[in-house]
Amino acid sequence: MTNVGGQAVLEGVMMRSPGNWAVAVRTPAGVIAQVTRPIESRMARHRWLRLPVVRGVMALGESLAIGFRALAISANYAAQEEGADPAEAEKELSRGALVFAFLIAIGFAVALFKVTPGLITEALPIKSGGWFVIVEGLIRVTIFVLYLSLISLLPDLRRVFQYHGAEHKAINAYEAGEELKPETVQRFSLIHPRCGTAFLLWVMVIAVFVFAFFGRPSWYWLIAERILLLPVIAGLAYEVIRFAGKHQNRVVMTILAPGLWLQRLTTREPSLDQLEVSIRALQEVLELESKSGESLVEVMA
């Protein structure tokens, strides 16, 4: 069975396999448009990039890059006027724009979820290095949950969360070997263990254990450590999510329960029309993958 993952985009879903990705979007005219692209992964060419932890860093970078490209295409379709040239909507971000968007996203995440909790904890009268790391971790998770709770209240994001749910349902149905029809897919769960929401929570949990080795550093070392150790922590979190995807037993699901619960904040029940879009993206990428050779790359989420 092909390893697949995806993400919600504007009025659509992006699905990816080891060697290809496809984005399907419901246009303002009501029809489904799809765009497909091959994935030229460095992990397929360099064995050392597939080593544990290292592969997690690479997978995260690739997922972010593909996600930005898919979002740009979906935004083009959403803004396209009736009768416009479809080729215009398929235009992607330039490499410079992609790098800029990547840096902005990473910078925002690091500032909000890494640096801010550290600085808040630094201002508290905590002398013990162990307690410092624990309190910082609790503040970090609290900020993350509050952030998800607040954005889930935004009306404009409701449809994005519905498409997120549609993505999960389609993948769950496919992995269960069921027929990919909206009425069938609708019966499946909104929750998936390899979801990026669960991955982010594990990044925060693992950070507590990693930072415990450094105690309570001075504020400038604190900021430097939180930034420089992020790739290592992300790589470790990837290994947890990867293991969970391969071993979905009761013990693993119990350990993953907090991350699965958080997905309730970022998914909503999709309509049959939205499931149709998600299924189209999945079918496109599966068809492309069936024509490709065996890949050494695994999909994160």
Residue ranges of model-derived segments:
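Divalent-cation
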Residues: 1-82
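Polar-ligand-bearing catalytic/cofactor-coordination segments
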Residues: 1-15, 19, 23, 84, ...
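Juxtamembrane/disordered regions of integral membrane proteins
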Residues: 29, 83, 97, 131, ...
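Multi-pass alpha-helical transmembrane bundle typical of ion/small-solute transporters
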Residues: 39, 44-50, 60, 67-86, ...
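Alpha-helical transmembrane segments of polytopic integral membrane proteins
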Residues: 67-70, 74, 113, 117, ...
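Juxtamembrane "helix exit" motif at the C-terminal ends of alpha-helical transmembrane segments
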Residues: 73-77, 105-128, 203-225, 234, ...
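Hydrophobic alpha-helical segments characteristic of transmembrane helices
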Residues: 77-154
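Alpha-helical transmembrane segments of multi-pass membrane proteins, especially transporters
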Residues: 102, 106, 132, 136, ...
